[in-house]
A protein has these predicted regions:
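Active-site core of glycosidic bond-cleaving carbohydrate-active enzymes
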Residues: 32, 324-543
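Extracellular/oxidizing-compartment recognition motifs
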Residues: 1-318, 327-328, 344-347, 363-368, ...
């Protein structure tokens, strides 16, 4: 994790080099480094509070010699009054194009930097800050004050993978225009403007509009922003004058609608374009059928994957959270790997989870920031993801690398005394999250524990660890027996809570079949059909 090391990125700049003298210029912004994390408002500067640069250019000549030009305080210059007035990865960007001239040619060798300052050396020491999540008894981890190591980035960079122009335009109020992309996207706009110098353009984003309901009287058809929470998702552009293009560089938004205000000349539809960012550069898997609704569902899944795989697997692309919740990550892993080639992407996530594992063996519920309050349904993600990666790519090295951490986690779970008990260990509230009907947490936790033990036996077998394979097989059998004796009513075959009261939820039957913990699969399957038919063949679970 960033607590222990910082990723360095390599670029091949051969194609940018020209004969003779060359120059290099770099613009710094917050990014993940000093942005707010964990949706707790005060958690800005999460990893560090100073944007800084450590770089070198390695030149290899035809005669085999090489020369290195590195950052230093003598040859490099710094300027802090450029056109970027404000930049936040989640909140947006403010850009004054009138000030752009002072640095437009800053990467050319003939640029005059005589008025610029000499930079100073900044130690790469992490700040120490943490916040407690009220009501859950868990805190986001302190960021240790230490000097991290530098390691090479081994995941593919985020790219622009799709483009889409606005489909409709509507004037909401004088000078306020709403553009509809007719598709949820995650990225930035590219807008062509024709305004006078000094004109201040405000650009906002939304996923949905207020519906025509009494409680929203006067707001219907305008942008609903409540689901963005503290993410203001607003860009500001101050025009230089004439035709100019604004494309934010140091932020990203999740949106379908773009609101542009402050303009005298509303951009045409073809002048409002959205650029989709993603770590998913191409899809190898697809689903096509004769059913239009099913096809659209499959398309939505692909778009959701593109929008939520930006450096890390996030829970949402728009609000102030955008965190790598492990439960979301491992549940979707099988689908993601069938859709796209993401071996390095997921191995990076596994690495972050292992790095954040506690000395006792507990995995984090969130990576790479750590912390959370999910419990077993989230902490087990490493086991699920490692097995999915092995099944997809057959690379035994993935299992070898992460197996010791998984063993440590299983020992931690054994010490917690979770399986085989009706005592609520209060290890986290996240089960079938936000479901219309509640499923007993112990039913879910023990189903997950069975699946963990089952997968660990398979992993140990793949690694040739026969003794450990048998140990995990025995544990899985024990938990499975306990689950069926505790959470299934013998007469009706319906699921029940740990106290013997009726559970009978769609989730309880689905998890029993999916994870293989049910002994009487036929009866459990019949109850799942009954529950699904009763709600019109819809999904009645949470996530």
């Amino acid at each position: 994790s960033a607590v222990d090391y910082i990723f360095s990125i390599n670029y091949d700049i051969t194609g940018l080099m020209k004969p003779g003298r060359n120059g290099i210029g770099v613009t710094l912004a917050s990014g993940w480094w000093s942005e707010a994390q964990t949706f707790v408002v005060k958690n800005f500067n999460y990893f560090g509070d100073k944007e800084s640069l450590l770089a070198k250019v390695v030149m290899k000549y035809e005669d085999g010699s090489r020369e290195v030009f590195g950052t230093n305080t003598e040859d490099w210059k710094y300027f802090g009054e450029g056109p970027y007035l404000f930049s936040s990865y989640f909140a947006g960007e403010q850009y004054d194009a009138r000030r752009a001239e002072v640095y437009e040619t800053y990467s050319l060798p003939e640029f005059d930097d005589s008025t610029w300052e000499k930079p100073v050396v900044v130690d790469t020491v992490m700040i120490e800050e943490f916040c407690t999540m009220p009501g859950f008894g868990r805190s986001w981890p302190a960021v240790h004050e230490q000097k991290p190591e530098y390691i090479g980035e081994y995941d593919a960079p985020v790219r622009i993978v799709d483009r889409r122009t606005a489909k409709t335009r509507k004037e909401l109020f004088p000078g306020v225009y709403l553009y509809d992309l007719e598709q949820e996207m995650a990225g930035v706009p590219r807008i062509t403007l024709h305004e006078k110098a000094g004109t201040k353009i405000i650009i906002r984003y939304a996923e949905v509009l207020y519906p025509d309901l009494p409680e929203y009287a006067g707001k219907e058809g305008t942008m609903m922003l409540e689901n963005y929470r503290d993410a203001t998702s607003t860009d500001v552009y101050i025009c230089r004058g004439g035709e100019e293009v604004f494309q934010p560089k140091f932020t990203f938004h999740g949106y379908r609608y773009i609101e542009i205000s402050g303009v005298e000349h509303a951009p045409e539809l073809e002048e409002v374009e959205s650029l989709q960012y993603s770590s998913v550069t191409e899809f190898h898997g697809s689903l096509t059928s004769s059913h239009k609704l099913l096809n659209r569902f499959a398309e939505n899944v692909s778009w959701s994957q593109k929008c939520n795989f930006i450096n890390i697997p996030t829970d949402c692309p728009q609000r102030n959270e955008r965190m790598g919740w492990a439960g979301d990550t491992h549940i979707f892993c099988h689908t993601a790997l069938n859709n796209s080639s993401l071996k390095k992407f997921y191995e990076r996530n596994l690495q972050a989870m292992r790095d954040l594992q506690t000395p006792e063996g507990q995995y984090p519920e969130i990576a790479p920031v750590g912390g959370g309050f999910g419990g077993i349904t989230y902490e087990c993600a490493s086991i699920f993801m490692a097995w999915e990666l092995y099944g997809q790519y057959g690379d035994i090295r993935t299992l070898e690398k992460f197996y010791p951490g998984m063993q440590k986690y299983m020992d931690y779970m054994k010490d917690k005394g979770l399986p085989g008990t009706k005592v609520n260990p209060a290890i986290g509230p996240l089960g079938d999250w936000l479901a219309p009907e509640e499923t007993d947490l112990l039913l879910l936790w023990n189903a997950f524990y069975y699946k963990e033990a089952d997968l660990m036996s398979r992993i140990a077998g793949a690694l040739g660890r026969t003794e450990e394979q048998h140990q995990y097989e025995a544990l899985a059998a024990k938990v499975k027996k306990f689950w069926n004796e505790t959470f299934v009513l013998p007469d009706s075959g319906k699921t029940c809570n740990a106290d013997g009261t009726l559970c009978d939820t769609q989730c309880s039957y689905a998890i029993a079949l999916s994870y293989g913990v049910a002994e009487d699969r036929k009866r459990i399957g019949e109850h799942l059909i009954r529950k699904t038919r009763a709600i019109g063949y819809t999904v009645g679970t949470g996530f």
